[in-house]
Amino acid sequence: MDVMRSVLGMVVLLAIAFLLSVNKKKISLRTVGAALVLQVVIGGIMLWLPPGRWVAEKVAFGVHKVMAYSDAGSAFIFGSLVGPKMDTLFDGAGFIFGFRVLPAIIFVTALVSILYYIGVMGILIRILGGIFQKALNISKIESFVAVTTIFLGQNEIPAIVKPFIDRLNRNELFTAICSGMASIAGSTMIGYAALGVPVEYLLAASLMAMPGGILFARLLSPATESSQVSFNNLSFTETPPKSIIEAAATGAMTGLKIAAGVATVVMAFVAIIALINGIIGGVGGWFGFAHASLESILGYLLAPLAWVMGVDWSDANLAGSLIGQKLAINEFVAYLNFSPYLQTGGTLDAKTVAIISFALCGFANFGSIGVVVGAFSAVAPHRAPEIAQLGLRALAAATLSNLMSATIAGFFIGLA
């Protein structure tokens, strides 16, 4: 029964995308079908097949080892504030976001910059991009951007496409925005993992976002023009560093900007949520609903969607609330509020944890529209009006991609 509910959830999400399509007659069943199959296959390999699960577990172990090295750098700056004694001192509540999550983002961004400098990332992107392009019957630039989003976030996509943004047609531009919103950056993945989110889920969600972003981009905005971009004019960085030291330093400074942005937004929005909850609770108290909050309202509104995705009805309000927080605010705040349920002795079952973990794994939120419009407009001011028009539709496509990955995850966890 649960498995069939997950299948129903996939159908519902596809139906929503079809209804939102701007040109239903031009939808390519070849591309849409291949993207859906690839998204399901990646989910099955990572979550259901023993070899795939083994690989995911090993990668997760490696990520945790990387995080341990990040803690070494944090400890040099903050001393015992990142040590295990903090948990003892504060009775298990010694995890400080600013001392554990933000330094990890800086470290991993520097590491990724080094990997780009020595050519590892470029080779991976070119190989995977070529395979992806043939499998899904999409343009080379679309496959390039989709694969790049495994490693980089939506903030970096404009810099990547800048050398040829004038040659991008409207559909390719839309796909680039969707892919960025549907994915997460490697640096922020470390941040989510530091909050207790299972790394194997984050890794699987990141990989599934590749075909997922293409799937819903092509459903909502089918391709109607031929591509004018080839792999011969792709550039991985706008101004390549001249040495490995410069690459590390540049990456660290970029990581600092990302960490500062994350800290600023999370701090502001947590405070804003507290204010909103105070207002809602105060007004609700006049009518006997003193405990009403933004989270509870979002939970009620999105609970049916969470249920059809595979979440038990008893947990649907919580899942709906977290999905709503991610959409209205951002994924960091949602994961932050999800974190207590991931602790030892949590009340959620494995399937619900997986579905929520996947559903929150992406940059798709209303704030991202502003980020995308601002970032793309900076490299292509003349296309700013067009980018602004695509923003809301791209958010819908990216959100559906995240929810589809979550539904597929629930399907395979239910089979296990």
What are these regions (language model features)?
Residues 68-138:
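Hydrophobic alpha-helical hairpins/lids featuring a short glycine-rich hinge
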Residues 126-160, 226-247, 294-298, 326-327:
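Juxtamembrane inter-helical linkers in multi-pass membrane proteins
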Residues 135-194, 320-408:
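Alpha-helical membrane segments and immediately flanking helix-loop junctions
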Residues 210-258:
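Long, contiguous bundles of hydrophobic transmembrane helices that form the permeation core
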Residues 253-344:
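Transmembrane helical segments that form the transport core of multi-pass membrane transport proteins
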